């Protein structure tokens, strides 16, 4: 059993999603958004760090998954996003959590089956996969999708490792 915290970083709204994985079974534990209503970036970063730390304390995840930085047309936006990712990652590392990063395209491909999927498609598939009564908020859905992606990637890595181990055992007999 593993608990995975997914983070969709944003300087105004940072989404989070927490799921439990037991084998191939995924269970929704919680999700939401850290909203920063202050204007100055240092204060926003402080609130995001505190929010992520509080979520980690509440859910006690085993793994931390976050969206990678994408190339933005606006350099200022990309820098702010990088700083938000930084404080979220520091919050995880301070709690001794292993950090995994996934590109937005990989997350959409894993959850929807199309790397260029729309937000509404991600919300719908997250709702379906986690058997939720309604679509989660867009940023929370993205964070849950990141956590789901981590589950699928780690499951595939484990299966490949087991296959290679079994193959090696067969050669040794």
Swiss-Prot record:
Its cofactor is Mg(2+). One of its GO terms (molecular function) is DNA binding. Keywords: Cytoplasm, DNA damage, DNA recombination, DNA repair, DNA-binding, Endonuclease, Hydrolase, Magnesium, Metal-binding, Nuclease. It comes from the Bacteria. Mg(2+) 1 binds at residues 8, 139. One of its GO terms (cellular component) is cytoplasm. It is found in: Cytoplasm. It catalyses: Endonucleolytic cleavage at a junction such as a reciprocal single-stranded crossover between two homologous DNA duplexes (Holliday junction). Its EC number is 3.1.21.10. It holds the Pfam family RuvC. Mg(2+) 2 binds at residue 67. Binds 2 Mg(2+) ion per subunit. The active site is at residues 8, 67, 139. One of its GO terms (biological process) is DNA repair. It is an enzyme of class 3 (hydrolase). The RuvA-RuvB-RuvC complex processes Holliday junction (HJ) DNA during genetic recombination and DNA repair. Endonuclease that resolves HJ intermediates. Cleaves cruciform DNA by making single-stranded nicks across the HJ at symmetrical positions within the homologous arms, yielding a 5'-phosphate and a 3'-hydroxyl group; requires a central core of homology in the junction. The consensus cleavage sequence is 5'-(A/T)TT(C/G)-3'. Cleavage occurs on the 3'-side of the TT dinucleotide at the point of strand exchange. Belongs to the RuvC family. NCBIfam families: PRK00039.2-1, ruvC. Homodimer which binds Holliday junction (HJ) DNA. The HJ becomes 2-fold symmetrical on binding to RuvC with unstacked arms; it has a different conformation from HJ DNA in complex with RuvA. In the full resolvosome a probable DNA-RuvA(4)-RuvB(12)-RuvC(2) complex forms which resolves the HJ. HAMAP family: RuvC (MF_00034). This is Crossover junction endodeoxyribonuclease RuvC. It comes from Salmonella choleraesuis (strain SC-B67).
């Amino acid at each position: 059993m593993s608990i995975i915290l997914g983070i969709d970083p944003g300087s105004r709204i940072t989404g989070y999603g927490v799921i439990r994985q037991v084998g191939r079974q995924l269970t929704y534990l919680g999700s939401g958004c850290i909203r920063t209503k202050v204007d100055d970036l240092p204060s926003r970063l402080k609130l995001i760090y505190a929010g992520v730390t509080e979520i980690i304390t509440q859910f006690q995840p085993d793994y931390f998954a976050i969206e990678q930085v994408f190339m933005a047309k606006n350099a200022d936006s990309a820098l702010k996003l990088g700083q938000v990712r930084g404080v979220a990652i520091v919050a995880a590392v301070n709690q001794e959590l292993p950090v995994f990063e996934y590109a937005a395209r990989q997350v959409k491909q894993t959850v929807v089956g199309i790397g260029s999927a729309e937000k509404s498609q991600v919300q719908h598939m997250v709702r379906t996969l986690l058997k939720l009564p309604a679509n989660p908020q867009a940023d929370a859905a993205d964070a849950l999708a990141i956590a789901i992606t981590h589950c699928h990637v780690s499951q595939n890595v484990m299966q490949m490792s087991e296959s290679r181990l079994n193959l090696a055992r067969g050669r040794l007999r």
